[in-house]
Each structure stands twice: as C-alpha cells, then as structure tokens.
C-alpha cells in the first residue's frame, strides 16, 4: 500500500491524466520508470511511451485508482508456500531495492535478485538478465522437486 506522500503523488498524477494530458503524464513519469542510462535510449523511451498510449488515459486512471485502493499484502506474502523470485532494479524509485528486500524477507521460500543499474521496468531495460534469472529459478525448482 502507498504511504501518504506516494498517495498524494498518485492523486496528482490522476488529476493530470484526467485533464487530457496523458502523454504529459507519461513523460513526467518516465524518470520514475527508467534508469538514467535507459532514459538515453530513444528506442526504449519510445516503446514505453507507445505502451502508455496503448493503455490509454481512461485505463491509466482506472489502474491508478486500483493501486490507491490496494491493501497491504504482508500476511499474504508470509503465507505463501511456493517458491518466489523477487526481481528489482538498483535504481528503481517506484519499488526501491529496500522494498524488494522487504518483500523477499516476508516470503518464506524466496530468492531476491537486484539488477544493478536498472530501474522499475527491468523486463525492458535488462530483458536478458530477467530471462536468465527466470530460467535459473525454474531450473532450480525443477531440480529441487526431483
């Protein structure tokens, strides 16, 4: 769940989106989603903007309201009885590494991977590293289950 400051930021973003400045919201948020190196990659920036455009203003606002209403899931994480891979970026400002560490610590059978120099959109910034981590995680589960 968001803290009070993050909640206020989210409400301001919703207001901006509702004022027909959806692309402006995307450009405004880009630095929250991407690392500085990724921000210099025009093709990647273009892909993220295209993804936001495809979501559309109405769906973006609905997503933000859903996030505002989410409850703390710490108890759910503690109760998980399955292997969990938590992947984060060292430069992720939306889910900072400390939060990824907290999530992993709450989950009994978790592995944590923090990708150095990567922001929030790790699958776009470091697709091979994420794929390798997932493949390794699945292989570990298969090996452990016999």
Q: Which residues make up each language-model segment?
A:
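Conserved alpha/beta-hydrolase catalytic His-Asp/Glu region
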Residues: 2-6, 20-79
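Structural signature of beta-strand start/N-cap positions in the alpha/beta core
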Residues: 76, 83-85, 108-111
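Short beta-strand/loop motif that positions the catalytic acidic residue
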Residues: 80, 86-88, 92
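Generic recognition of short, well-ordered alpha-helical segments
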Residues: 4-8, 75, 98, 102, ...
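Glycosyltransferase donor-binding loop in the core domain
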Residues: 17, 52, 92-95, 119-125
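Short alpha-helix in the alpha/beta-hydrolase fold that links the catalytic acid
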Residues: 82, 96-105
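Catalytic active-site module of serine/aspartate enzymes centered on a nucleophile-bearing elbow/loop
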Residues: 108-146
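Hydrophobic "lid"/C-terminal helical patch
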Residues: 29, 64, 103, 130, ...
């Amino acid at each position: 769940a968001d803290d009070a400051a993050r909640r206020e930021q989210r409400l301001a973003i919703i207001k901006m989106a509702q004022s027909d400045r959806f692309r402006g919201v995307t450009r405004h948020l880009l630095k929250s989603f991407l690392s500085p190196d990724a921000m210099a990659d025009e093709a990647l920036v273009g892909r993220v903007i295209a993804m936001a455009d495809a979501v559309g203003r109405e769906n973006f606002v609905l997503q933000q309201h859903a996030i505002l209403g989410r409850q703390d899931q710490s108890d759910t994480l503690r109760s998980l009885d399955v292997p969990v891979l938590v992947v984060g970026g060292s430069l992720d400002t939306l889910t900072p590494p400390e939060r990824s560490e907290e999530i992993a610590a709450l989950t009994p059978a978790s592995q944590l991977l923090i990708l150095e120099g990567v922001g929030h959109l790790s699958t776009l910034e470091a697709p091979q590293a994420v794929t390798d981590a997932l493949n390794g995680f699945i292989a570990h589960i298969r090996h452990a289950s016999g």
